[in-house]
């Protein structure tokens, strides 16, 4: 007689084995109707799976994050069901859940079109609206193989042969005449899978191996109700409007071309923003007492072998040779910084030593993964490495955390998710060292009143790590900042200092990045601001326009004054209507549009309006310059009078 303990501590006793669905029905018909699956003693189970002994049970519904993930997985099976009805010759590969949706890789000679996708979506909805039950059968390995062999499903057979033990009992999920294989769980009925949309088609190699056949990958999204789906699609539409590639072209910030894949050609205005970001971080480095250094772009293979990168990372490194020596273009800055540390004898009195670089790095990312500024091959990293004693770790990490939050808040990012990755199974050092390292990171986070999630076993083999993920205005997550302890690299590269007792000791190395890749962070900012940069970042802060030729000399005089004040200003003296000029510079997202007519010229004033169309009236040029200077020095995210 199993006794079921529910999350509120209440218990229910049954005279026979029961399923999660049975328990839900015993509680009430509403919960039975909403039940998708169950978490039994911490493990997700199908709603139909029997519970034979005493257990703790949480009933999963579409209100739970796990419930949404399950219905998305079931939508992938629904997609398979529809595909096999429309194209019976299709061979099904894999159909996992991804962020906000799912995909299915299929082998079909017919190249799917947008019309086909619409037909597929229509058939999926027709099937889902019949509210058929999903039937689960647990079978032997051989029966599963025979089932898929009879259907000609060679990819399912390959999964069984290569990934599943012959002693296993795979679960088959029957969607009427369609059968799929999965660990589950899945929804018990297709009434849960009626709010979805197929999004796109792409190519994908089987097993991710370019030597295998190219399959077609169909992406979809699925949600618990119509409102959630509509909200997500509206967010995607807004994201498309904010696409940094589109805005980058509109504002003439940068371009990329086939002859240099993953490399950025910065144009004047884009480079202006890039340099402003650098200047901002450089001020932070000075505030937090860092040295700024510059290491070579390319170093001998021997050094990369000593650091361990050649063995672990060589596939992502660009290499070249000269005079019988092999070189690698650096993918990261850390080995170079250790070389700088090693020049000259270091004492414990020199520590902590904080070393920063705007390092130009290159990584040989797969061409298919490149995406505008977000995924490139050549990038600048706001990298820093702190050499310190073990006793100094907590204070230094705390300082890094403060710098991260100080920096992100300047750009308007307040929603930061923090994760602490702890010791993996394969690691250097003893448990005592890891205990101290992990506790130092925890204490630093707690000292700054930061909530964090622990990711057990996700740390690097050489030390634990803190990751900072910022959420933008569309609630998309961007992992940017990291603070990583390293107990291995200084030792591998011979870094030592003289301790207080005159012994030679190896320093702890803290890897620290805040923006990460400046290119990627600039892409994030373009999308966050939709190209409407705050005044301090805007490549052109002010444009001054005349109404007639009579004001041309005065306009040039005003612009000259602004430039002398350090304000990025330009003029527009074209023989065009003032409304046309205002519209054009509004589309260029220039923060302030200044208009000069006869009256303004006579009174040494300018008529000020913002790119949002707010009329700020007439101001003396000295007064306007003072207001702008204050806004820039405060790095305000708002325009005047907002």
From Swiss-Prot:
Residues 1-61 form the TGS domain. Its cofactor is Zn(2+). It is found in: Cytoplasm. Zn(2+) binds at residues 334, 385, 511. GO terms for molecular function: ATP binding; metal ion binding; threonine-tRNA ligase activity; tRNA binding. The keyword Cytoplasm applies. Its EC number is 6.1.1.3. It catalyses: tRNA(Thr) + L-threonine + ATP = L-threonyl-tRNA(Thr) + AMP + diphosphate + H(+). It is an enzyme of class 6 (ligase). Belongs to the class-II aminoacyl-tRNA synthetase family. This is Threonine--tRNA ligase. It comes from Shewanella oneidensis (strain ATCC 700550 / JCM 31522 / CIP 106686 / LMG 19005 / NCIMB 14063 / MR-1). The lineage of its organism: Bacteria, Pseudomonadati, Pseudomonadota, Gammaproteobacteria, Alteromonadales.
């Amino acid at each position: 007689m199993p006794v079921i303990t529910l999350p509120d501590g209440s218990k229910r006793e049954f005279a026979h084995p029961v399923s999660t669905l049975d328990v839900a029905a015993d509680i009430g018909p509403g919960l039975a109707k909403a039940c998708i699956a169950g978490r039994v003693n911490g493990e997700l189970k199908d709603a139909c799976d029997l519970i034979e002994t005493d257990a703790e049970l949480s009933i999963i519904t579409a209100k739970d994050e796990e419930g949404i993930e399950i219905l998305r997985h079931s939508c992938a099976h629904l997609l398979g069901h529809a595909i096999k009805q429309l194209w019976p010759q299709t061979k099904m590969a894999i159909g996992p859940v991804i962020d906000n949706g799912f995909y299915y890789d299929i082998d079909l000679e017919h190249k799917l079109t947008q019309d086909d996708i619409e037909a597929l979506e229509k058939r999926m909805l027709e099937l889902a609206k019949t509210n058929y039950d999903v039937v689960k059968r647990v079978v032997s390995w051989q029966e599963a193989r025979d089932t898929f062999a009879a259907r000609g499903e060679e990819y399912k057979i390959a999964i069984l042969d290569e990934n599943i033990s012959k002693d296993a009992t795979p679960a088959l999920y029957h969607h009427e005449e369609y059968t799929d294989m999965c660990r589950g769980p899945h929804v018990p009925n297709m009434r849960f899978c009626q709010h979805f949309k197929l999004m796109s088609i792409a190519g994908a190699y089987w097993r991710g191996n370019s030597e295998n056949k190219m399959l077609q990958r169909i992406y979809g999204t699925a949600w618990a109700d119509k409102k959630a789906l509509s909200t997500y699609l509206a967010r995607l539409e807004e994201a498309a409007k904010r696409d940094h590639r589109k805005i980058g072209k509109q504002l003439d910030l940068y371009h990329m071309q086939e002859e240099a894949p993953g490399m950025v050609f910065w144009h004047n205005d884009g480079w202006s923003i890039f340099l402003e970001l650098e200047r901002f971080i450089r001020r932070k480095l000075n505030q937090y007492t860092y040295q700024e250094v510059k290491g070579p772009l390319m170093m001998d293979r021997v050094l990369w072998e000593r650091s361990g990168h050649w063995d672990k990372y060589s596939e992502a490194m660009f290499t070249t040779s000269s005079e019988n020596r092999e070189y690698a273009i650096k993918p990261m800055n850390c080995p170079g910084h250790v070389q700088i540390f090693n020049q000259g004898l270091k004492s414990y009195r020199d520590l902590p030593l904080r070393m920063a670089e705007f390092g130009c790095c290159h990584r040989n990312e797969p061409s298919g993964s490149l995406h505008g500024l977000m995924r490139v091959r050549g990038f600048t990293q706001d990298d820093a490495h702190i050499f310190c004693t073990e006793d100094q770790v907590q204070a230094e990490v705390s300082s890094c955390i403060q710098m991260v939050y100080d920096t992100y808040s300047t750009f308007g990012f307040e929603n930061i998710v923090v994760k602490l990755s702890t010791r993996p199974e394969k690691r250097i050092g003893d448990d005592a060292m890891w205990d101290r390292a992990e506790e130092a990171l925890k204490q630093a986070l707690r000292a700054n009143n930061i909530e964090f999630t622990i990711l057990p076993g996700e740390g690097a083999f050489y030390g634990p790590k803190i990751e900072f993920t910022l959420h933008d205005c569309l609630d998309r997550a961007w992992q940017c900042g990291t603070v990583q302890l390293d107990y291995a690299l200084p030792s591998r590269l011979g870094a030592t200092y003289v301790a207080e007792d005159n012994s030679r000791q190896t320093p702890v190395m803290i890897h620290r990045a805040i923006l990460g890749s400046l290119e990627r962070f600039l892409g994030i900012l373009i999308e966050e601001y939709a190209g409407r940069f705050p005044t301090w970042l805007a490549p052109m802060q002010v444009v001054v326009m005349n109404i007639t030729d009579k004001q041309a000399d005065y306009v040039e005089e005003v612009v000259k004054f602004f430039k002398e004040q350090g304000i990025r200003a330009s003029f527009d003296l074209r023989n065009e209507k003032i409304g046309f000029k205002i519209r054009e510079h509004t589309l260029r997202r220039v923060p302030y549009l200044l208009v000069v007519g006869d009256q303004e010229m006579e009174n040494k004033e300018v008529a000020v309006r913002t790119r949002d169309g707010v009329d700020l009236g007439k101001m003396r040029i000295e007064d306007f310059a003072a207001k702008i200077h204050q806004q820039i020095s405060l790095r305000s995210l708002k325009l005047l009078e907002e």
